[in-house]
């Protein structure tokens, strides 16, 4: 039987705001430096959604330190239920906040003693990012601006924030100051305040995925997307590949947006497609040396 990973939980803060946010790390504690994977959830996601803890254990058993975080304004309250419950925080989230949250985590990992992770367990020269869905777009942007990142994997990644907003929706959103979306899983009515769009426009140079992938993303990139994705079109994967021709792209037949996962996930094994995504990502990272 495989060894059980050590799991440590910790709180983070960002210089961009005053809201603390949670992260955890799964690893086999052997005192040897291991490559580090940082995993970023997507829109309406959180670090303990579905099979993500099974995923973290699997990566740990394959020789990685696997760190995942709750982005600070994702709706999860530190010490709360673990699910989405703070709708005001959710509504005031934006892409700059998320990028800065991820940066705060990377900074903390590079400062011994800032997290409970022993420095002896970390090989910071092999720092990999994985992002799912909107988190996939986020890790592309972070890698483009942060040379500490060794390589990136996008799992059903968003390729462009801008094209998701039709002109009529934008007009109504600006006029009302807020739009609401429904969480199909919980039935919650979730606000998105117009500041999200304002932040994107004000920081477009930093937040424009197509431009940053074409001009600044130098690290190796793996793109994984299901051909039955019901949330983000498969064309997004092809777009990313066209902007970064040296990227490796894998289309998974029959895979949906969550690669077979759901919340809650009581099983102790990964969904079939999530297992394939994990294995392909592990091989990609390990082949980089």
Name what the model sees in each region.
Residues 145-195:
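Hydrolase active-site cap/lid region
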Residues 1-31:
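N-terminal cap/lid segment of alpha/beta-hydrolase-fold proteins
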Residues 228-232, 257:
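Acidic catalytic loop of the alpha/beta-hydrolase fold
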Residues 216-217, 223-225, 229:
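Short beta-strand/loop motif that positions the catalytic acidic residue
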Residues 255-259, 263-289:
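Catalytic active-site module of serine/aspartate enzymes centered on a nucleophile-bearing elbow/loop
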Residues 52, 219, 232-243, 264:
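Short alpha-helix in the alpha/beta-hydrolase fold that links the catalytic acid
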